[in-house]
Amino acid sequence: MKQVQKGFTLIELMIVIAIIGILAAIALPLYQDYISKSQVTRAYGEMAGTKTAIEAALFEGRTPVLAATAAAGAAATPPNEWVGMLDNPTSNLLSAATLTPGANAGDVTFVGTLGENANSSIHGATITLTCTASGEWTCAVAAGTATGWKTKFVPSGCN
């Protein structure tokens, strides 16, 4: 009587493990890049949410300001107007934000720095939103101090 084989041979198991290893080696870097891009896009979205408040303040002739932390002390009193974000954001991705009036009336530059819990490849990157007096917004993302920065992390709608 012939014996029926039960289970797998050692070579079959080794081939399966090799295939899993190859797939993991390809998938892990792609997943890390996906996480980095989604975090940059989320931080951009958090910053872009203040654009309407900034435009409203500029339209009313006020100076848009970020709510200062207790140590900074810049008051959001007329002619300043708070635009809904702190200079030390409570976001777990943005570690710092600055809102600076430009040289011309109505110009403003809003810069956010990725830090805190951002992926290590984007930690220290900056997102800059700039508004001109005509109300036109531009966006730029720079590596800053991020060591693993890739241009594919820039969100759509941002140059």
Curated annotation (Swiss-Prot):
Removed propeptide positions: 1-7
Cysteines engaged in disulfide bonds, as pairs: C139-C158
Protein name: Fimbrial protein EcpA
Gene Ontology CC terms, in alphabetical order: membrane; pilus
Family to which the UniProt record says this protein belongs: Belongs to the N-Me-Phe pilin family.
Membrane topology: Single-pass membrane protein
Entry superkingdom: Bacteria
Principal subcellular localization: other
Cellular compartments annotated: Fimbrium; Membrane
GO biological process, one term: cell adhesion
Keywords for the protein's UniProt record, in alphabetical order: Disulfide bond, Fimbrium, Membrane, Methylation, Transmembrane, Transmembrane helix
Source species: Eikenella corrodens
N-methylphenylalanine: residues carrying this PTM: F8
InterPro entries the UniProt entry points to: N_methyl_site, Pilin, Pilin-like, T4P/T2SS_Core
Transmembrane regions listed in the UniProt entry: 8-30
